[in-house]
Design a protein with these regions (language model features):
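N-terminal Rossmann-like dinucleotide-binding module
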Residues: 1-48, 72, 184
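Structural detector of well-ordered beta-strand residues that form the stable sheet scaffold
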Residues: 54, 94, 119-121, 151, ...
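Rossmann-like dinucleotide-binding domain that binds NAD(P)(H)
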Residues: 160-218
Length: 221
């Protein structure tokens, strides 16, 4: 199997993890990283010994040696424009959630990937947890029988809430529950949603982070 040259745009919390994992992966030949904070760029470069480290993500997009890009930037409003440039540059792309803030932008990115014949996926990490994959296997082989309903509840700590809120106005579904929705739909494929009802509560977090406290969603498949 050919080894890949990978570029990572954004090496903060999640991007830093991906950079370290890529540096240790035998399938990765060259690692290129980009981070707008010089101190963090140096910190991650010291940990990963990349082929190149830059403050400007466009340096990675112009590098013909790079096959694939991972985008892990904040605020989340940066996902769409950087992803668009990446796909237009003909690079394979792993983009952290959310894919974008509007359906129109999401459809455009998918269309660009298809047009340029490149792989494009969202970083839904739950699929790679062994216990989650095991449950899906039991859906597929019939051990669990015909699914009637799926109930998922996700709670996050106050510390994590402070870390991820306030950057962009997004619902709890877009920020966190998207992982659970992806997992449920992965298990239930090829079934598709046909109707959705959702409601959220805004009392505490809205004062400082412009985010809702909780969200309830009912999805008919």
């Amino acid at each position: 199997m050919d080894r890949l040259n990978v570029g990572i745009i954004g090496t903060g919390w999640c991007g830093g993890i991906r950079a370290e994992a890529s540096a240790k992966n035998g399938l990765v030949d060259q690692l290129h990283i980009c981070e707008i904070r010089e101190d963090r760029l140096k910190e991650v470069a010291d940990l990963t010994n990349p082929t190149s480290a830059t403050l400007d993500y466009k340096d990675l997009l112009k590098n013909d040696d790079i096959h694939a890009i991972m985008i892990s930037t904040t605020p989340e409003s940066t996902h769409y424009p950087i992803a668009k440039e990446t796909l237009e540059a003909g690079k394979h792309l792993l983009l952290e959630k959310p894919i974008s803030r509007t359906l129109t932008e999401a459809d455009e990115l998918i269309g660009l990937a298809e047009k340029n014949k490149v792989q494009f996926t969202i970083g839904y990490s739950q699929r790679f947890r062994s216990k989650y994959a095991y449950v899906r296997e039991k859906f597929i082989d019939g051990t669990l029988g015909e699914p009637v309903s799926v109930l998922i509840s996700r709670n996050i700590t106050t510390q994590l809430s402070k870390r991820i809120t306030g950057r962009t106005r997004l619902s709890p579904a877009a920020m966190e529950a998207t992982h659970d929705l992806d997992y449920a739909l992965w298990c239930l494929a090829p079934r598709k949603p046909v109707r959705v009802y959702s409601q959220q509560v805004e009392k505490v977090l809205i004062k400082n982070s412009n985010s809702a406290d909780c969200q309830l969603s009912l999805i008919h498949i």
